[in-house]
């Protein structure tokens, strides 16, 4: 599964409870986008979560 190249956010695992409280394992996946960003004055493809994109932690390439 993908991780954010900026903050390192990745999938989390936990339990999903039914109405009768039986447990089944499920995953929460981060919203990760493939973005062309500028790193050291060169455009590079990065996997970035939308929280980092909204916060402006990535300078996007045109």
From Swiss-Prot:
GO molecular function, a single term: structural constituent of ribosome
One of its GO biological process terms is: translation
Q: Keywords assigned by UniProt?
A: Ribonucleoprotein, Ribosomal protein
Q: List the Pfam families.
A: Ribosomal_L28
Which cysteine pairs make disulfide bonds? none
Xref: HAMAP family: Ribosomal_bL28
- What's the protein here called? Large ribosomal subunit protein bL28
**Species the sequence originates in:** Thermoanaerobacter pseudethanolicus (strain ATCC 33223 / 39E)
Q: Which gene encodes it?
A: rpmB
